[in-house]
């Protein structure tokens, strides 16, 4: 069994073709038809970092401690979330894209991989927050390419 969990950042809930919009999203439309869609979800917070921590952990912001952007999720709490549970159950887990469980402009720097510039260690691939393999967009709002892209490409471009 394969589980592909897709989240997007700062978009309306009805912005995809499978939601009736005119935009063409054929691959996402096919996945939506064949899979499970969570169409009645409510975000636990107005900004993305606490919301992403809640998705990973299943906890509300006042429980996992990330109440605003710039507050890093404790890796021990993150590792106990769904990715860690799937990993312990024998699934191969991975994360590709912008995780935003921590930031380089955090109020309390923790030294997690997301707190480094993306060109410092482009070949690092985890483990992280319960995921065995990660390919992160580090500093999720980069406007410059990394100095040494891994395997010749990078998700920031």
Language-model region placement:
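Formylglycine-dependent sulfatase
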Residues: 1-157
